[in-house]
């Protein structure tokens, strides 16, 4: 591994430990020339998954799009960025563990709504209103009634 300080091409590993719940290896290294220490992370490279959009276009899966949507839905709500990242991690893992090459944006949206419903109902309704493109207040009320019915059962 090239030293980020002096550019020397060789270093030794001083410490290795799992990170990110075992999905990453964190290594502490020391340059054999300048003796400065630095940290590297090793992660399995996943095969790209394509997302099929509503208009049938395909684009590479981008977790930041999910996170941005969740952040907007959770604005001014008691939901931490750690909780939001956990949702995105869970969804990303479910997608990759499905062993599929493609997934529809609709399926991803449903996964997000399912997770938000369990975490914060207001954030869920906000996300659903944009995702399902509520046309008027009646559509909004219908979704709230469904949520209340599920809560009672």
From Swiss-Prot:
Domain of life: Bacteria
Zinc finger (unnamed): 3-34
Cofactor annotation: Zn(2+)
Keyword Repressor: yes
Database matches in PANTHER family: TRANSCRIPTIONAL REPRESSOR NRDR
InterPro entries linked: ATP-cone_dom, NrdR-like_N, RNR_NrdR-like
Limits of the ATP-cone domain: 49-139
Lineage, uppermost ranks: Bacteria, Bacillati, Bacillota, Bacillota incertae sedis, Caldicellulosiruptorales
Protein name, per record: Transcriptional repressor NrdR
Pfam families for the chain: ATP-cone, Zn_ribbon_NrdR
Cofactor binding mode and count: Binds 1 zinc ion.
MF terms (GO), sorted A to Z: ATP binding; DNA binding; zinc ion binding
Stated family: Belongs to the NrdR family.
Keyword Lipoprotein: no
Its biological purpose: Negatively regulates transcription of bacterial ribonucleotide reductase nrd genes and operons by binding to NrdR-boxes.
Alphabetized UniProt keyword annotations: ATP-binding, DNA-binding, Metal-binding, Nucleotide-binding, Repressor, Transcription, Transcription regulation, Zinc, Zinc-finger
Gene Ontology biological process terms in this record: negative regulation of DNA-templated transcription
């Amino acid at each position: 591994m090239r030293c980020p300080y002096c550019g020397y091409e060789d270093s030794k590993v001083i410490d290795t430990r799992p990170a990110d719940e075992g999905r990453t290896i964190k290594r502490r290294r020391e340059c054999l020339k300048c003796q400065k220490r630095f940290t590297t992370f090793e992660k399995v490279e996943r095969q790209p998954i394509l997302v099929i959009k509503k208009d049938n276009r395909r684009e590479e899966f981008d977790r930041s799009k999910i996170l941005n949507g969740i952040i907007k839905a959770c604005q001014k709500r008691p939901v931490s960025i750690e909780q939001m990242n956990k949702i995105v991690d869970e969804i990303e893992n479910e997608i990759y563990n499905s062993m599929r090459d493609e997934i529809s944006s609709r399926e991803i949206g449903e996964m997000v709504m399912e997770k938000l419903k369990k975490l914060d109902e207001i954030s869920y309704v906000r996300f659903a209103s944009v995702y399902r493109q509520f046309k008027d207040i009646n559509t909004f009320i219908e979704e709230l009634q469904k949520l209340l019915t599920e809560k009672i059962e």
